[in-house]
Structure formats: structure tokens, C-alpha cells
Design a protein with these regions (language model features):
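Generic start-of-chain signal for non-secretory N-termini
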Residues: 1-19, 26
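Short, ordered loop/turn segments at secondary-structure junctions
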Residues: 37-39, 128, 238, 321, ...
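Duplex nucleic acid-engaging cores and interfaces of nucleic-acid transaction enzymes
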Residues: 49-52, 59, 63-318, 322-425, ...
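Long, highly charged, low-complexity intrinsically disordered interaction regions
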Residues: 55, 61-79, 89, 421-519, ...
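Structured, non-catalytic alpha/beta "coupling" segments that mediate domain-domain communication
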Residues: 73, 87, 98-100, 225-240, ...
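A glycine-rich phosphate-binding loop feature that marks nucleotide/adenosyl-phosphate handling sites
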Residues: 180-188, 319-323, 379-384, 405-412, ...
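Single-stranded RNA-binding regions, centering on S1/OB-family and related RNA-binding modules
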Residues: 546-714
Length: 714
């Protein structure tokens, strides 16, 4: 298989682009580095394209390795033919290779292998050849052998049929066609083990759907119901069609001596060998496809969460709500430094005195540190805490706003080794409150400290392939961190770990170097960091910024390898280093990019990136994202009325709809059918993404079930 050509066709990009990208990956370059600094080589392939390419490249290389192993194994058995080799080499999936290898794979003891040991293979061949005119039962008597365990002609025939059944089951073409028939015409069914018990799987108690139509989230739902022993799930294949297909391909002519036996072997082969394994394969393939879709959605949601615009340079009070153990508070300054922590008890079990004390404490903190925003976690006791905040603001008139932030993962972080190292003198509640405050100030810098799987913007994330989920989300975080870039002198080790070319060990060494030698004043000093060699420097330098260093270019995304060309360009244009960042409109006055790039010895795309950086150094792509909604009053779920139009924030996007925070502590659902009135929506991500500010209308409110139905068809 020509892997380069295959990838070119699959990804719909030119062969030379794929070739260049593969070479760059094989040379040890990271995806963010290739995407940002090797645009000429790859024809501007972006992060998403490069990650898909890398994923498929890995799969296809593993496939080629597997083919080689299979060919060697069959050759060692002396059974490899030119035709079989060609079929294996042409296979495009691991399933296809498995089908071809099945007859030659070393098997555990089976009914067929036992029959072969009893010397019944010649009888099986006679029946399968379907040319015998003599009664098979008479011929079978010749194979009676008490020593081998064949006591009767009936046992001999049964053993022969077991061999034929396995031969049929091992036929690669039959398996492929039966699998295809099952996919095209089969159904998934589920029934409740205990129909009288009410569960969240009510919709699947008597459920049936065509395999070709079933949505990924329903596959994951029935899988979970099955895992929890609530549902029995089956694949119902078009059995009559499949048996008819096998009979047409296996039965030759109309030999009344052999045909009944061949039919029996076909039926047994399908029922005992083919159907169970095809059902498993179909379920696995459906699950894999559903998981891939869910992981993709999770990744897209995570991008939006990580890329939320920071609310920088604001003093924030982080509030981790709770009942019995009290609400933990942490005040952080505009740089994220913790100024103060405390615990208040305004929520149940409480007293008027404790509520008054809590409000007094809040007023003192707000006035002492000039708190501008309260960042309230959305966990247990959040509703009650919000009520206290609103009462306080109304009573005092303090110029403070509040926002409810998703605290998912805060408790995981607060109990982690990393949090202990960062806040050795704080308890888990204080750490959690500080994290809730900081994730408002700079969501990206704070959320990278948490396992992406714990952030909670997806569906069924705990049920799927954790390795694949982890790899995808790590890639998402890496892409986001490198798109934004980091300040070399303030970035934490967890944040630095996601920078291109830097691993956990090097990240810690950078922080240690900074603590020992003081601030970095130029990028080249990175080469003095332990274990950070020339290759790592090449990969990371452009993503690390020094805002007040000796070289103004170190504050930009211009890579050090392009400094000479950049300085030559600046000289040609009469630009002084002090003018960097004050060159609005520079890109418009350059008349001939190709000619100028050629003169400078760089590519045109690189030159355009350099010009953009000189105009606006280290631009933050998060600035273009919707700003979070700050509130000063509370709305209760009971206040909602049908027809009300509200502004909300998209919290989560899943296959069947969108969850929107409208400020009532219970996210409302906009079903996929309610997203757009002008066109059919195949997936919600076509319309909205996490973090979007949207206008919604209340369709219905169920206070008992705590369900809010919303529509965007306004």
C-alpha cells in the first residue's frame, strides 16, 4: 500500500503536502511547530489536518506491520500463495487482514480440530465437494474407529459437518459480505431485564433501530445500560437473507446425497460460529464509531472552554460553595496571587447569626482588597450561595458583579500533588476556591492543571476508550496552549508542559532555572536550561514570549530562526525595534510579498506571519471569543415562564442538543430540532459551540424533574 497516496486521497490534500508533513513528523517535529512554522513545506496544513494525518499515518503503519506478520506466519506454515499474498497486501483495514488470516491462525481446540484429529477431514471434503452418488451415511461407516473416538456413522458425519462449518466460517469473503449485510439490513434491539423498574433507560426498554440509522449517543446509551445490567442488547441480523447467500455460494447443483448435510453445516456455521463473532464485531465497530464521534465533540467543546477570553487584571473572590463544611473563599489579585482565604457558613445548616457573620466577612474582604468580581462555583450549595451574594449586593450597593463558573475538576485539582506543591499551606477547600477564581482570570492557564477528562464537557466520556480519549484531549490542550503562547517568566510548569518540544521534566527545569537565575531576558537563555537541547529549543522558542527582554522580537511569535530575515525586512522598511506593535496597516502597504520574501530568503507565508506579528505582537486569539456574562441579580427556576426570552451561555454541546446556562442553576436543553428554523441541522456544532452567548426562549419548565426546554427558533 502506498501510504502517502492513501493519506492524500483520504484527507483530500496534495501528495507533496502529505509527504512533507510525514517527513517533518518523522524528524521529530511537533504538530504545533509544523502548523505554525513550516507552512511553506506543508502548504499551510492546520493543526486539525495534521492531527488527523498523524492518527491515520499511525494506523496505516501499524496495518502494514500487521500484514507483514501475517504473511510471515502463513509462509512459515507453507501455505502462502501469490494470490493470498496479494489479497493481504491489498487489505485496507485490520478487520480485512484478520478475515484473511483466520483460516491460518493457530486455534485453540475446536469441534473441527477434534474432528480432524479423528481423521474425518476426508469425509468432510467428500461432502463439501458435492459429487458423491453413494449414500453419505454408508460412506461414513468407513470412518468408524473406536480408538479415535468415532463410534458410529452418525458421529463421523457430525464431525465432518463440524469441519465444514469451520471452513465456511473462516472464508474471508463470506465474512465480509455477511458483515456488510448485517450493517445494511440489521437492527439493534434492547429490552429491560426488569421492565417494572423505572430508570434513566426507560426509552430503551423496548427499543429497535436500523443499524444504518442509529446515532452515536444512542449506541453509547444502550452500551451503558447493558454494562449496568439494566438492558439486554442484541444485533438482529437478516438471517434468512444471509443463509440464502451462503447456500447460493456453497451448494453446487442438486445432489440429494450431500445437499441436506451441506445445508446443516451452513446453518450450524452461521448460528454457532459466524453470527456471534459478527455481532461482536458489529457492536465493536458501532461503539468505536460512536466513541470517535463523542471524542471529537468532547475535543471541540474543550477547545471552546480553554479558549474562553481571560478576565485579566481584576481582583477576584473565588467561592467554593458547600453546606455543612462551609463555603471556602479565596481572594486573588490581578496576577492570580492569593491574597487571603477564609471559610463562611451562610448555607444550611445555618442560623441568622451565621448568615450575618458571613455577610460581614464578605464586605470586609471586598472592601479591603477592592474585589471586582465574585467567581462562584456551580457545585453543591451554589444556588443558596448565589442568593447570599445577591442579597449582599442589594443591601450594600457594592460595585461588584458575580459569575457562576463551571467548577468541574476543581476538587480533583485541589487534592492533587500539583495543588499541594502550589499551595502547601492550604487545605483542599482553599485550593479549590483559588482555582475557581483563577479559572475566571485565565481559564487556559488554570484548566491545564486538570486532567482534561475531568473537565466535563462531553457525553459518556467515562465509558469510552480512555487511552484514545486521553490522547485526543492532550492534543487539544497542546494546540490551544501553543496557539495562545505563554509568558516564559510567569508560566507554571503544568502550562509549560504543553508547549511544543517541552515535557514535564524540562518544564520543571525551566521553572527551577527561573527561580535560581531570575527572569529570562532573552530566548537564547533557554539553551542553558538542563535537558533543553537544540531540537527542543527549535520546537518551543516561538511559543515562549519575553515581554520585557533585551530583544523586542522575543515578545512576538516570530521564531528565532527568522530573526535575521525580520531585521533585514525592518531595515528595508525603515522600522525601528521600538515601533514593534505600533505598525497598524503595515500589511497593506507591502505591494509584492513574493518578491520581498524571495529577497529576504524566506517563504511568502512566513513573511506574512512576520508582518502580522510586527503589527500586533503575540495577538491572543481568545480576544475574538464571546465574553462571559457577569450578573448582579438572581433568577429562580420557578420564575421562568413559557415564552420568556433570555440570554445564556452554551455550557455543553452533545449529539442531540445543547445545554445552556440561563442563570437559574439548572442548564436548559435546546434539542437539536430547536436550533435553527431555516435549515436542517445534522449536528449542533454546526450552529453553536461551548462559550457562545445565545438568545433562547423558554418552551417548558418541569420543576419536579428539574428540566428546562428551550428553543433558539425565536
Amino acid at each position: 500500500m502506498d501510504i502517502i497516496l492513501k493519506l492524500s486521497d483520504e484527507l483530500d490534500v496534495a501528495k507533496w503536502q502529505v509527504e512533507a508533513a510525514v517527513n517533518l513528523i518523522d524528524e521529530g517535529n511537533t504538530i504545533p511547530f509544523i502548523s505554525r512554522y513550516r507552512k511553506e513545506a506543508t502548504g499551510s496544513l492546520n493543526d486539525e489536518q495534521l492531527r488527523k494525518l498523524f492518527e491515520r499515518l499511525t494506523y496505516l503503519r501499524n496495518l502494514e506491520e500487521k500484514k507483514a506478520q501475517v504473511i510471515n506466519s502463513i509462509a512459515e506454515q507453507g501455505k502462502l500463495t501469490d494470490e493470498l499474498r496479494a489479497e493481504i497486501e491489498a487489505a485496507e483495514t485490520q478487520v480485512a487482514v484478520d478475515d484473511l488470516y483466520r483460516p491460518y491462525r493457530p486455534k485453540r481446540k475446536t469441534r473441527a480440530s477434534v474432528a480432524k484429529e479423528k481423521g474425518l477431514e476426508p469425509l468432510a471434503n467428500i461432502i463439501l465437494l458435492q459429487q458423491e452418488t453413494e449414500d453419505i451415511k454408508v460412506i461414513a461407516k468407513q470412518y468408524i474407529d473406536a480408538e479415535k473416538g468415532v463410534k458410529t456413522a452418525k458421529e463421523a458425519v457430525q464431525g465432518a459437518l463440524d469441519i465444514i462449518a469451520e471452513v465456511i466460517s473462516d472464508n474471508a469473503q463470506y465474512r465480509k459480505d455477511i458483515r456488510d449485510l448485517t450493517f445494511r439490513l440489521g437492527k439493534i434491539t434492547s429490552v429491560a431485564k426488569k421492565p417494572e423498574e423505572k430508570t434513566v433507560y426507560d426509552n430503551y426498554y423496548s427499543y429497535e433501530e436500523d443499524i444504518v440509522k442509529i446515532a452515536g449517543h444512542r449506541i453509547l446509551a444502550v452500551n451503558r445500560g447493558e454494562a449496568e445490567k439494566i438492558l439486554t442488547v442484541k444485533v438482529v441480523a437478516p438471517e434468512d437473507l444471509i443463509l440464502g447467500y451462503l447456500e447460493r455460494h456453497i451448494i453446487v447443483g442438486q445432489n440429494s446425497n450431500t445437499e441436506p448435510f451441506v445445508r446443516l453445516a451452513i446453518q450450524d456455521s452461521y448460528a454457532r460460529l459466524i453470527a456471534p463473532s459478527i455481532e461482536t464485531e458489529v457492536r465493536n465497530m458501532l461503539t468505536e464509531k460512536a466513541e470517535d464521534g463523542a471524542i471529537s465533540v468532547f475535543g471541540k467543546n474543550l477547545v471552546q472552554l480553554l479558549m474562553q477570553p481571560p478576565i485579566a487584571n481584576k481582583v477576584v473572590l473565588g467561592w467554593d460553595p458547600a453546606f455543612r463544611t462551609g463555603c471556602k473563599l479565596a481572594v486573588v489579585d490581578g496576577t492570580g496571587k492569593v491574597l487571603d482565604t477564609t471559610v463562611i457558613y451562610p448555607t444550611a445548616p445555618t442560623t441568622p447569626q451565621k448568615i450575618a457573620q458571613a455577610k460581614t466577612t464578605l464586605v470586609k474582604l471586598i472592601t479591603k482588597y477592592k474585589v471586582e468580581i465574585i467567581s462562584l462555583g456551580n457545585g453543591t450549595a451554589s444556588r443558596e450561595s448565589e442568593q447570599i451574594i445577591v442579597e449582599l449586593l442589594k443591601e450594600t450597593g457594592l460595585p461588584v458583579q458575580y459569575i457562576i463558573v463551571n467548577e468541574a475538576g476543581a476538587s480533583v485539582y485541589s487534592a492533587s500533588k500539583l495543588a499541594t506543591e502550589e499551595f502547601p499551606n492550604f487545605d483542599v477547600g482553599q485550593r479549590s476556591a483559588a482555582s475557581i477564581a483563577r479559572r475566571l482570570q485565565d481559564p487556559l492557564a488554570e484548566l491545564v492543571k486538570i486532567d482534561p477528562k475531568s473537565i466535563g464537557v462531553g457525553q459518556y466520556q467515562h465509558d469510552m476508550n480512555q487511552k484514545k480519549l486521553g490522547q485526543t484531549l492532550e492534543g487539544v490542550v497542546e494546540d490551544c496552549v501553543n496557539k495562545v503562547g505563554v509568558d516564559l517568566n510567569t508560566a507554571s510548569a503544568p502550562l509549560l508542559t504543553y508547549i511544543s518540544g517541552i515535557n514535564g521534566s524540562i518544564a520543571k527545569n525551566i521553572v527551577a532555572y527561573r527561580e535560581k537565575h531570575g527572569k529570562f531576558t532573552e530566548r537564547e537563555q533557554l539553551l542553558n536550561v538542563d535537558k533543553l537541547g537544540a531540537k527542543a529549543y527549535e520546537q518551543c522558542a516561538g511559543f515562549l514570549r519575553i515581554s520585557d527582554g533585551t530583544n523586542p522580537l522575543d515578545a512576538t511569535s516570530v521564531h528565532p530562526e527568522s530573526y535575521d530575515a525580520t531585521l533585514a525586512f525592518m531595515k528595508k522598511q525603515g522600522i525601528k525595534p521600538s515601533s514593534i506593535g505600533k505598525l497598524a496597516g503595515l500589511s497593506k502597504i507591502i505591494k509584492n510579498y513574493p518578491k520581498l520574501a524571495s529577497e529576504l530568503g524566506i517563504g511568502e507565508l512566513t513573511l506574512r506571519d512576520i508582518v502580522a506579528e510586527l503589527e500586533k505582537p503575540a495577538r491572543d486569539p481568545r480576544d475574538e471569543m464571546p465574553k462571559p456574562i457577569l450578573r448582579s441579580d438572581v433568577l429562580e427556576m420557578k420564575d421562568l415562564k413559557e415564552g420568556m426570552i433570555l440570554k445564556g451561555t452554551v455550557r455543553n454541546v452533545i449529539d442531540f442538543g445543547v445545554f445552556v446556562d440561563i442563570g437559574v442553576h439548572q442548564d436548559g436543553l435546546v434539542h437539536i430540532s430547536q436550533l435553527n428554523s431555516k435549515k436542517f441541522v445534522k449536528h449542533p456544532l454546526e450552529v453553536v459551540k461551548v462559550g457562545d452567548i445565545v438568545d433562547v426562549k423558554v418552551m417548558s419548565v418541569d420543576l419536579d424533574k428539574k428540566r428546562i426546554s428551550l428553543t433558539m427558533k425565536i
